[in-house]
From Swiss-Prot:
Keyword hit for Mitochondrion: yes
Example GO BP: mRNA processing
Keyword field contains Disulfide bond: no
Residues annotated as domain Reverse transcriptase: 49-333
UniProt entry keywords in alphabetical sequence: Mitochondrion
Name this protein carries in UniProt: Uncharacterized mitochondrial protein ymf40
Subcellular location: Mitochondrion
Any one Gene Ontology cellular component term annotated for this protein: mitochondrion
Classification via InterPro entries: DNA/RNA_pol_sf, Domain_X, RT_dom
Amino acid sequence: MTKCNYEQLLDPEIFRLAYELKKSKSGNMKPGADKETLDGFSQAYVEKVVRQLKDESFQFRPSRREFIPKADGKLRSLGIPSPRDKIVQEVMRRILEPVFEPRFLDSSHGFRPHRSPHTALRQIRRWTGTSWMIEGDIKGYFDNIDHHLLAGFIAELVKDQRLLALYWKLVRAGYVNQGKAEPHLLTGVPQGRILSPLLSNIYLHQFDLFMEEIKVKYTTTGALSKNNPIYLKARNKYYKLVKSLKASSAEIIRARRDMLKMTYGIQTGSRVRYVRYADDWVIGVTGPKALAVQIKEEVSTFLQEKLKLSLQAEKTRITNLSRSEALFLGTLISITTRKYVQSQKVGGGHRRASLGRIRLCIPIDILIGKLSQMGACDEKGTPKAVTKWIFLNVGEIINKYMAVFRGYYNYYSFADDIHHLLQIIYILRYSAINTVARKLGLNTAKVIKRFGVDLIFRDHTNEIKHKLNFPRSLPNKRMNFALSPPSDPRVLFDTSCARIQC
């Protein structure tokens, strides 16, 4: 097992690596509450910080508190550390992550190496037979993490008291809000700190372990169902009529209809599955609704008693996947319900289509809503010009529209209904035409006549300089999950979990 100790913090090389990583991100060059930037970060500066860490005189500075609007109209609190503190936090992350990462479970996907929303959704894709889905929503998760509990979880693997003391210095650094100092109340992991994703995963790792116990407790061994004798009887009747020379077409159709009304299996067992991405999680249940209700109650009790967290009652839903859809990581989840008999024979008999296969679909109404907020269309999806882009040059305008499309296309590459992105292409195409028309002082008909619906702009040699390069078709690739992390759904649109990394 990888171990960590305070002495690792005193290596100037790890500070250099942390600095190189942080300076590559423009947002990290912004000053914190102390107005300091990374521009003056030098070898002498590193040596000074290392000396302070060595004699334990180092103190974190208060983070600058900012508030950004959430989708529900409320404000989300961010804590922006000074660039110096970002570097120290990055060094701490590099020391702590190798210790905790091997302990995290396969059910956890948020803010982890080689994991992404796609790895979480790929796991759910395999949940064939799931009847119910519990959509989890923890009330104010990041604001309600108990630091005494979190320190205890860290101390299970980190035995160096100086590292734990440095953690408490970070916690107690507090904030500066509009020039006024605010003490830390010892609850909440501020979003915006480098360590926030790792700390939040350490905290909810306890929930992951609890869910492993729930899975073992409620997942039965053996087959989950047995053949329904009533269905078998109806099926045999249907095939006899098909083979009979005396049966009328009406009799055959009626027998087939009666057969397809029935389920071919009777549920005899249960199965529980679970996936988490940051503070967003879902539980898949194969079994009766009563089992899903029982699990939800046990989850609520565990979170309250062991982690001092509460479920958001109105947002924690139990969804019947055969009748409705659950929303997780910007994706609608349901199961196939179509019943039909395939003509091919398997083992001397006819094979029936598999029911309960997971469908992952695009929440097209949400996407249109985001395009409406962007100004590309109205609430009904009718395209219009994005007036704030009129002052860009034509190439920049086209690049803006293509970037929006690529974000959605790369994220939803796995969707069962990826053809719905053709509606997004339509909106973006004609919004772009309207925007270019406004810029050039032309009507849309003249823009289309001059440049085509792809807005093809050529240079003086007649080479294509700019073009809307939308695909003409969108083939369905259900298992087309990205190996590298795609855009986080928080960037595409505001889901229920908050952006926590700076």
